[in-house]
Amino acid sequence: MNSGTKISAAFFVFFLFAYFESEAQTVILSVDRGKDSIPSQRGPNLKKISHVFFNFGFVAGADKPGARIKYGSSVEYGIGVRKKYKISPVYSIGWELGFDGKFFHLDQQDGKIFPDTTLNDAERMDYGSTTISFFNRFNLDPNRGNFMGTFLDLGVKGCWDWQIYHVIKNTLPDGSKVSSDISALPYVNHLNCEMFARVGRSHLSLYASYRLTNLFKSLYAFPELPVLMAGFELAIFRQ
């Protein structure tokens, strides 16, 4: 099983977890209000809400000499479960548990030094991460009713990069193809931290994240991969 398949399998397992978490929320939301004497506390603009979200983004930050990347094909995707707690009509707090996959495609050009000077047909760094995030939400339409509305999120994310692969692909002189997925890399840091911002309305939002820590140990003096990612998010909940 190659690195991409392993990360996709982990993504699928987390999807099942998130799906059943969402179903548990749905059962509560589908109570017949005419028969229920206790007002619900769960909803987009009620006391609390749980829901699933998906995100997809691109590397947006500047690369460095010696570790140039291919923009457009260097991407990230993620899935998670979000818990939001309303403090006031304009302010909420929350946390998220998620799984992220990141893929940095390395440009093969003279001057490359990360992770070595060898030029290959294709080369990338694959990351599979479990994440936990905490955020502040500021709503811009306090009189919106039970509706998610327009919002700004500011938060921090801790990442445990438990799957990291250096992937190399080449074509041999006889035309056969060889691919190597190298793990147990001695130069990587497995714990990282990001800060992020989201601007959205209802189910859709745009986000940007900025990595605060180094992916590589300082002992190796490698140029860092880009720290900025940007993309969009889809939240799944009943309006």
Q: Language-model features: where?
A:
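Predominantly the C-terminal beta-signal and adjacent terminal strand-loop region
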Residues: 183-239
